[in-house]
Amino acid sequence: MKRSLKNNPFVANPLLRKMEKLNRREDKILIRTWSRASTIILTMIGHTIAIHNGKEHLPIYITDYMVGHKLGEFAPTINFHEHAKNDNKSRRSKMRIDY
């Protein structure tokens, strides 16, 4: 369900304060955050934010097409590694039971 238009987009307060301070000083430094639920707003464009994926911080450069999306959408939390082709234990095989 979409967020009501009466409410402002959610941005964590520490992240918002850091963005405003960097925009006033016109600095371009890496910002580390654990707030994956924060919405990307216009003041974040042009900055690099390191978003935590549960294991490490992934640096993401914010562009204008990302506005309105959540930070967590750009930092995947799981990586699927394919099973080896010749590993029969990890692949499911059909089990036949003869009576």
From Swiss-Prot:
Keywords for this protein: Chloroplast, Plastid, Ribonucleoprotein, Ribosomal protein, RNA-binding, rRNA-binding
Pfam families (alphabetical): Ribosomal_S19
GO CC, alphabetical: chloroplast; mitochondrial small ribosomal subunit
BP term (GO), one: translation
Subcellular location: Plastid, Chloroplast
Alphabetical list of PROSITE patterns matching this protein: RIBOSOMAL_S19
GO molecular function, one term: rRNA binding
Transcription regulation found in the keyword field: no
Similarity comment text for this entry: Belongs to the universal ribosomal protein uS19 family.
Function: Protein S19 forms a complex with S13 that binds strongly to the 16S ribosomal RNA.
Protein name: Small ribosomal subunit protein uS19c
Annotated source species: Oenothera argillicola (Appalachian evening primrose)
Gene name linked to the record: rps19
